[in-house]
């Protein structure tokens, strides 16, 4: 599975939301993510990809779409 596929799968498991067709849509505006969901997602991403997501790196505008989350995870994997 690619990073993108794993993240889409995580959204399905955590939030019962298929985000595969809304990869550029703001997930907060779409009602997929909220503050609690963000915490759940960070924990899942850290476990899934064996990375550490610093809270200072997880700004809403930087991680508000699936595509931005994929890029953020890839950057942290390469750090």
Swiss-Prot record:
Keyword Signal: no
GO terms (BP aspect): cell wall organization; lipoteichoic acid biosynthetic process
PROSITE patterns reported in the protein's UniProt record: CARRIER
Record's protein name: D-alanyl carrier protein
Modified residues (O-(pantetheine 4'-phosphoryl)serine): 35
Pathway(s) annotated for this protein in UniProt: Cell wall biogenesis; lipoteichoic acid biosynthesis
Location of the protein in the cell: Cytoplasm
Any one GO MF annotation of this record: D-alanyl carrier activity
Gene of this entry: dltC
Entry similarity comment: Belongs to the DltC family.
Annotated SUPFAM superfamilies: ACP-like
Organism, as annotated: Streptococcus uberis (strain ATCC BAA-854 / 0140J)
Keywords (A to Z) from UniProt: Cell wall biogenesis/degradation, Cytoplasm, Phosphopantetheine, Phosphoprotein
């Amino acid at each position: 599975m690619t990073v993108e596929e794993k993240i889409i799968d995580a959204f399905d498991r955590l939030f019962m939301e298929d985000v595969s067709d809304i990869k550029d849509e703001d997930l907060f505006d779409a009602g997929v993510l909220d503050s609690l969901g963000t915490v759940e997602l960070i924990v899942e991403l850290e476990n899934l990809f064996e990375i550490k997501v610093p809270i200072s790196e997880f700004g809403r505008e930087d991680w508000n779409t699936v595509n931005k989350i994929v890029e953020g995870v890839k950057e942290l994997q390469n750090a």
